Amino acid sequence: MSISDLRQSYDDAPSFDVGDLADSPFDQFRQWFKQAVDAGIMEPNAMTLATVDGAGRPDARVVLLKDADDRGFTFYTNYGSAKARQINAHPEVTLVFYWDVLFRQVRVRGAITKVDRNEAEAYWRTRPIKSQLGAIASSQSQTLKDRQQLEDAFQAAVDKYGLEGPVPLPNDWGGYRVIPSSIEFWQGQRSRLHDRLVYARDAEGWQVKRLAP
């Protein structure tokens, strides 16, 4: 198999033009997100988070969207993690959702800020108990001697809090919200004539433009 021979024709892609867009990019995202869920895509809330560190070196990883409303796009993490340190150094990020079954991706660019403690607490209480214990056990992005060190830390958390809880929200764990300055909706099309429609925020609100593929 040659990697260069792997191609997708996008012959069955639906049409997508400015007239198809919702007035709000957040409404448009919710429409596409629901369609991704309905299409049975595994983890449609998975998104690539791209950051830049203090030396200007880019980094990226997949995280899970946990809320999307007119304020922005929210995910949760350890505030001592590499991504958190990079966000502190350069609080502008990009998110990318890719839904292959629908030939679609969404790219979100904008500033990023921490969610408040009450909001983080409310989300924390919805997490499975073992996920809470895992967050307690993991000093994210820190070097481990071996797997057993992590297993031992998890067992120590179980011994302390039990499997019924409650487990308190750690001080070094919480959420971030990406506040978009632009959101691009990409629809794959035949002959590589893909549709790229962008909402860009200015002083008057959201403006829409089409970009060449």
Language model features with spans:
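Binding-site signature for planar aromatic cofactors or substrates
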Residues: 1-213
